């Protein structure tokens, strides 16, 4: 069986899925806290930028993959309105349940679905927009997931990937210190789970950099792929169209 990486560890492909599931079952109840710790609260600004770039309009069909606690889903559902169709999806049952409950608590009624991004259960050319925020790096076969995202996107639609990326060189030393020393300590102190936070830091380092991901999206068949660096490359928003 083929090998892949789980953080810095080399594991069998089927083992990665189990390990990633374990991480997100563990952090689900504290996921918003995790995002705050990992990003020093900046994830809200990055998501707001993504929402603005998405420009969802009334009647849009939107697929939010690895949607977690539903920050993007909530904004898209409000923008698409009653004539739209916005799906809140995640491969992890714990994350899906937490996200669904939080959406309902905020008065957002939209369908939630347990969904593997490598095998999306929707027909070709269905969605105006497909998004994944902070989820692609945890997927075993990123190329397959990107191809699936393109498949279910309508001609004229877009795929958007918001993900941690490669920081600019002047920031690297401080960023490494925060990621590998401070973040696990915070995870232990506030969530009693240093190991999950250590994996998340490692998974960021193993994720393709900005230009590599751009090439992967092009190889998946997406057109006019571009990206924006946010916060010195800590995060990048990639966007590709389907012509």
From Swiss-Prot:
<dbReference type="InterPro" id="IPR004033">
    <property type="entry name" value="UbiE/COQ5_MeTrFase"/>
</dbReference>
<feature type="binding site">
    <location>
        <position position="69"/>
    </location>
    <ligand>
        <name>S-adenosyl-L-methionine</name>
    </ligand>
</feature>
<dbReference type="GO" id="GO:0043770">
    <property type="term" value="F:demethylmenaquinone methyltransferase activity"/>
</dbReference>
<keyword id="KW-0489">Methyltransferase</keyword>
<dbReference type="GO" id="GO:0008425">
    <property type="term" value="F:2-methoxy-6-polyprenyl-1,4-benzoquinol methyltransferase activity"/>
</dbReference>
<comment type="pathway">
    <text>Quinol/quinone metabolism; menaquinone biosynthesis; menaquinol from 1,4-dihydroxy-2-naphthoate: step 2/2.</text>
</comment>
<comment type="function">
    <text>Methyltransferase required for the conversion of demethylmenaquinol (DMKH2) to menaquinol (MKH2) and the conversion of 2-polyprenyl-6-methoxy-1,4-benzoquinol (DDMQH2) to 2-polyprenyl-3-methyl-6-methoxy-1,4-benzoquinol (DMQH2).</text>
</comment>
<dbReference type="InterPro" id="IPR029063">
    <property type="entry name" value="SAM-dependent_MTases_sf"/>
</dbReference>
<keyword id="KW-0474">Menaquinone biosynthesis</keyword>
<dbReference type="Pfam" id="PF01209">
    <property type="entry name" value="Ubie_methyltran"/>
</dbReference>
<protein>
    <recommendedName>
        <fullName>Ubiquinone/menaquinone biosynthesis C-methyltransferase UbiE</fullName>
        <ecNumber>2.1.1.163</ecNumber>
        <ecNumber>2.1.1.201</ecNumber>
    </recommendedName>
</protein>
<keyword id="KW-0808">Transferase</keyword>
<dbReference type="InterPro" id="IPR023576">
    <property type="entry name" value="UbiE/COQ5_MeTrFase_CS"/>
</dbReference>
<dbReference type="GO" id="GO:0032259">
    <property type="term" value="P:methylation"/>
</dbReference>
<comment type="pathway">
    <text>Cofactor biosynthesis; ubiquinone biosynthesis.</text>
</comment>
<feature type="binding site">
    <location>
        <position position="90"/>
    </location>
    <ligand>
        <name>S-adenosyl-L-methionine</name>
    </ligand>
</feature>
<comment type="similarity">
    <text>Belongs to the class I-like SAM-binding methyltransferase superfamily. MenG/UbiE family.</text>
</comment>
<keyword id="KW-0949">S-adenosyl-L-methionine</keyword>
<dbReference type="GO" id="GO:0009234">
    <property type="term" value="P:menaquinone biosynthetic process"/>
</dbReference>
<keyword id="KW-0831">Ubiquinone biosynthesis</keyword>
<dbReference type="GO" id="GO:0009060">
    <property type="term" value="P:aerobic respiration"/>
</dbReference>
<feature type="binding site">
    <location>
        <begin position="116"/>
        <end position="117"/>
    </location>
    <ligand>
        <name>S-adenosyl-L-methionine</name>
    </ligand>
</feature>
């Amino acid at each position: 069986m083929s090998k892949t990486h789980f953080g810095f560890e080399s594991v069998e492909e089927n083992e990665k899925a189990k390990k990633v599931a374990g991480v997100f079952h563990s952090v689900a109840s504290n996921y918003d806290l995790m995002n705050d710790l990992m990003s020093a609260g900046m994830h809200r600004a990055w998501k707001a930028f993504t929402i603005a770039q998405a420009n969802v309009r009334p009647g849009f069909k939107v697929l939010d993959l690895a949607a977690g606690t539903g920050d993007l889903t909530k904004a898209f559902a409000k923008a698409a309105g009653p004539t739209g169709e916005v799906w809140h999806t995640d491969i992890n049952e714990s994350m899906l349940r937490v996200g669904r409950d939080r959406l309902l608590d905020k008065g957002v009624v939209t369908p939630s679905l347990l969904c593997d991004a490598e095998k999306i259960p929707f027909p070709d050319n269905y969605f105006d927009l497909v998004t994944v925020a902070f989820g692609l790096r945890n997927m075993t076969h990123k190329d397959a997931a990107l191809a699936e995202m393109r498949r279910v996107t309508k001609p004229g639609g877009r795929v958007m990937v918001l993900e941690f990326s490669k920081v600019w060189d002047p920031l690297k030393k401080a960023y490494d210190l925060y990621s590998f020393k401070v973040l696990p300590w915070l995870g232990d102190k506030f969530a009693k789970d240093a190991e999950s936070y250590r994996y998340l830091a490692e998974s960021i380092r193993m994720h393709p950099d900005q230009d590599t991901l751009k090439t992967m999206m092009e190889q998946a068949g997406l057109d006019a792929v571009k990206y924006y660096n946010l916060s010195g490359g800590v995060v990048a928003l990639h966007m590709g169209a389907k012509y």
